[in-house]
Amino acid sequence: MSQQVIIFDTTLRDGEQALQASLSVKEKLQIALALERMGVDVMEVGFPVSSPGDFESVQTIARQVKNSRVCALARCVEKDIDVAAESLKVAEAFRIHTFIATSPMHIATKLRSTLDEVIERAIYMVKRARNYTDDVEFSCEDAGRTPIADLARVVEAAINAGATTINIPDTVGYTMPFEFAGIISGLYERVPNIDKAIISVHTHDDLGLAVGNSLAAVHAGARQVEGAMNGIGERAGNCSLEEVIMAIKVRKDILNVHTAINHQEIWRTSQLVSQICNMPIPANKAIVGSGAFAHSSGIHQDGVLKNRENYEIMTPESIGLNQIQLNLTSRSGRAAVKHRMDEMGYKESEYNLDNLYDAFLKLADKKGQVFDYDLEALAFIGKQQEEPEHFRLDYFSVQSGSNDIATAAVKLACGEEVKAEAANGNGPVDAVYQAINRITEYNVELVKYSLTAKGHGKDALGQVDIVANYNGRRFHGVGLATDIVESSAKAMVHVLNNIWRAAEVEKELQRKAQHNENNKETV
């Protein structure tokens, strides 16, 4: 049996299901490229049959990613598998992942079927997927609540049909680690052809046991772990990949397995996922939380100063979290900024140096010194907002006080035209938003507003993340500035640009559909 554990990332499929606003194709690609740098073996990036947007995302990522295998999800339905294959065919290497429920409860109440019918359907669909690729994964949905004898029958049949990976999900996060290990061991004992496939696990955190269950399964013989960065996902989330990866690295003495992950990319990938998905990382989150390597106890601090290994089982550097430096000021040139980005591991293709340097100079004039986390924040925001903008914040001014009604005046560039409006509001941010809404006449409803500090002290950058509802769809916007009202305004303008771009995409899709329809009529 191989000692390498395959890392299967589902941040962009199962993880995205938990988000309040869907990610754009560009945002998904940004995360996919980060996962590729981190070295994930397989990335599941969508459910193509679910929507044209998901199909486009899968196809775009499949075209761009070269060093990881790209995977798409499909139910045991002919159309699902055919559409998944169509979206993936541009990839260097791809996998089709198909699934069907196997537990008595799901078979009886959801599928209204029988186990024999489920097995027959699984065989047919695995064979159909094999017509497109020799890499087919089959999942037994709700395997954690499936009797072992039934599960063994399904697994044996799927392998005989051509499945090369068999996934055993704890779909509702119900099993205990010793139970889950028993399921994996039981399959090895009962399935005669199990050596012809890789056994995978997909766990959920409803009882806080997703990572524990995955590691127990690895110890019992599983050689693929599925999960999401930062553990994002439906309900209580998925298995946190960064936790499993580092547990395998730190406790190699017991597990005796390894991964092909570039550990130096873990922290940066985690931060990127957090920012793009608008899901802050708790300070006490294992591996990537801001307190993961902090020591406040005097006894602990003394021990760490004498020898870090007294209280640290891994180092910040082992996940790519290096010490903050204070070496850039308004007198630093473009070469210095580029050199620092190089040192932090960023490639030039990941940011626009001209835009970054302009933003850096403006910030350096305000703050004096610019930190690494400032540069990363500027690069991230620049990447998010580098697409052509229809709306641009030209000017704003607010007046408010403890006994005054907040008033805002806003100038907004709308295409080639600059428009101005003033409005009152419940505080300066609300006043700015009311003025922006008057200018655009978009009936935007604010669903979520969050503010986080990027840096330390009074000169920290304020990052505002908002989720807004427009015509039944949710859009995410982000803004960054030393002034909170300014970053709030920028976040709303980002939302408006996302709404405008979505409308333009919809117009283009309608135009293409009409063009195709006209061609059919001509023929």
From Swiss-Prot:
It is an enzyme of class 2 (transferase). GO terms for biological process: L-leucine biosynthetic process. It is found in: Cytoplasm. The keyword Transferase applies. It catalyses: 3-methyl-2-oxobutanoate + acetyl-CoA + H2O = (2S)-2-isopropylmalate + CoA + H(+). Residues 5-267 form the Pyruvate carboxyltransferase domain. Pathway: Amino-acid biosynthesis; L-leucine biosynthesis; L-leucine from 3-methyl-2-oxobutanoate: step 1/4. It holds the Pfam family HMGL-like. Its cofactor is Mn(2+). GO terms for molecular function: 2-isopropylmalate synthase activity; acetyl-CoA C-acetyltransferase activity; manganese ion binding. SMART domains: LeuA_dimer. Its main location: cytoplasm. Keywords: Amino-acid biosynthesis, Branched-chain amino acid biosynthesis, Cytoplasm, Leucine biosynthesis, Manganese, Metal-binding, Transferase. Residues 392-523 are annotated as: Regulatory domain. Mn(2+) binds at D14, H202, H204, N238. Its EC number is 2.3.3.13. It comes from the Bacteria. GO terms for cellular component: cytosol. Belongs to the alpha-IPM synthase/homocitrate synthase family. LeuA type 1 subfamily. HAMAP family: LeuA_type1. Catalyzes the condensation of the acetyl group of acetyl-CoA with 3-methyl-2-oxobutanoate (2-ketoisovalerate) to form 3-carboxy-3-hydroxy-4-methylpentanoate (2-isopropylmalate). Homodimer. This is 2-isopropylmalate synthase.
